[in-house]
Amino acid sequence: SDNSLNSPYIQGNFRISSKLSFHYMRSRLLNLLRRPFTSSAEAYYEPKALSVNYLTYKATDKLTVSLFDGGVWSKGDSITSRRVDNMFYNPIPLLNGIAVSDNSKFYSMVGLNASYSVSDRLKFYGQLVTNDFETGAYQLGFRYYNFFGLKNAMVQFEYNDVPSSVYVSQNSRLSYSNGNLPLAHVKGNGFNEFVGRLNYEYQRFYIDVKFVLYTLINHQNTVLNAYSNNKNVVSGKIQHQQYELGYRFNKKINLTLFGSYIYRQDDTSTLPNTQFF
């Protein structure tokens, strides 16, 4: 995740056939809860573990489908430590969610990704995700290159819908987070998001425009933390606009002179309007 803290991990990529590939990753995460008893100078944070199995199938030259199987595993609590369950190392997608039924030890996430290239210029993509097969979220979007005959131009639109119950485990210590930061999205859950992007390059000049609109619905900033007394529920809208204009002196080393303007409007904040140059 680009949003949470760095964490140690091991991973491997395996090409099973010309159409089938597999990604295996295991990581050690932290809850920002210190153990109450320690023999060291500083108490350790509570550890937990993350497993990811990602299977990708290229059905045709245009259609690609991927199955995501992720899980957060208990390694103890604030007092005791224990080895992670042996099923943590299992590489077979979906098996963990079936074989491990103890919600106090394991939190399961299952997702399905798909992308379809209509042509070299137009690509649609989407994603579905569910936690313990109880509730889910989805993403839909497309990218269009060289639209209207404009060379070196790209437009992208994307929509994300993530209910407030997604990524939250019945055992709060196993929620989908690391270091009190969400793994999947900067807002965690409880939001709708619309993303628009346009960029165009002419010779050495370029322009890049980004627009993001969040609609927060029953959102809690700390709901993915291992422990929180903050029960404040937030609803509202956040708008983010960014404009960048630049000139590339050397494309090989990306030597660029640019200027940018950022505008942010947040009706859930005490500082609703912010501008940056």
Go through each PLM region and give its residues.
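Surface-exposed coil loops of outer-membrane beta-barrel proteins
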Residues: 1-57, 66-102, 178-180
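Exposed, low-structure sequence patches enriched in small/polar residues
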Residues: 58-59, 63-277
